[in-house]
Amino acid sequence: MNLHEYQGKQLFAEYGLPVSKGIAAETPAEAAAAADIIGGDKWVVKAQVHAGGRGKAGGVKLVSSKAEIEEFAKKWLGNNLITYQTDENGQPVSRILVESCTDIADELYLGAVVDRSTRRVIFMASTEGGVEIEKVAEETPEKILKAIIDPLTGAQPYQARELGFKLGLNPVQIKQFTQIFLGLAKMFVDKDLALLEINPLVITDEGNLHCLDAKVAIDGNAMYRQPALKEMHDPSQEDEREAHAAKWELNYVALDGNIGCMVNGAGLAMGTMDIVKLHGGQPANFLDVGGGATKERVVEAFKIILSDDNVKAVLINIFGGIVRCDLIAEGVIGAVEEVGVKVPVVVRLEGNNAELGAKVLADSGLNIIAAESLTDAAVQVVKAAEGK
């Protein structure tokens, strides 16, 4: 789950990190009034969406009057911001962050992520702040400094000092950097984060370090023990179908094809999409119904898949281990009848009671095509999607 910038900065402030004074406004009037509360004669206004590239898209602006703030808010509130990280429709803007202006002498990058290869939290820092870190990693990987955090000891001050020296910071700045580094490391563990970024972490004209941005993502598997963070969830920033799927504990990702896929198991789901592609088809989605593929979940999965008007056929690929294939077949039949599926449905069942499941499908009298193998299923569904 992602947080908005203003929410991330609220967390930063709780952990003693230096952030700008800011107010998230929901109306143009609130945005203009925020300038009086913040004070000063220059402000930065930022459209709040879960996407990078806002500056290039016009979603961030330096202003020097309340009239400019109000004009910016009127332009974006209620509208969609399109950046290189969004789809063609963009993401809706429901809040504008108004912040005090910070004079910048230099820009750095600081971030942390769970690294699967080392099975550790890894911090990354770079002198190339304010730009896309992916681009830096690709073109000049030597400019990215790393510190791997041992889960037994946690982040250590010496690691922060080592990064600070390599970033070219002076002694006072290294002390500030150490406090930021340790604060972020504690927050990462306390809040069950999957990723955090400060891009840029700036050096002000006075020579102090300041967190100018905040990107925070929480591990969705840990949301049950982070109720306060769960309240910060903004469903408007998610694909409507993906949000619906999450309510039913279905893993769904929308794609651009015309063949709907319903599979139990993430690995099998990816393999299914690969073989559909191999035989000339285009998957419309990734959908993992998991181990508990009950009739109710299959019904909801059908509803989600068929809410995409591009879907011309559906492939169901189930490996029966704990789940019996005959029960899955009954669930599929019930779902097809309840939802009123109008497109061809190809089903491949393998494993526990697979033959019985195939018989249940054959005896149903519905337009359900039982495949003999995964290859056969892919060939059949591609033909069905093409109307052959």
Curated annotation (Swiss-Prot):
Its cofactor is Mg(2+). One of its GO terms (molecular function) is ATP binding. Residues 9-244 form the ATP-grasp domain. Binds 1 Mg(2+) ion per subunit. The lineage of its organism: Bacteria, Pseudomonadati, Pseudomonadota, Gammaproteobacteria, Cellvibrionales. SUPFAM superfamilies: Glutathione synthetase ATP-binding domain-like, Succinyl-CoA synthetase domains. This is Succinate--CoA ligase [ADP-forming] subunit beta. InterPro entries: ATP-grasp, ATP-grasp_succ-CoA_synth-type, ATP_grasp_subdomain_1, Succ-CoA_synthase_bsu_CS, SUCC_ACL_C, Succ_CoA_ligase-like_bsu, Succinyl-CoA_synth-like. It comes from Saccharophagus degradans (strain 2-40 / ATCC 43961 / DSM 17024). Substrate binds at N264, G321, I322, V323. PROSITE patterns: ATP_GRASP (PS50975), SUCCINYL_COA_LIG_3 (PS01217).
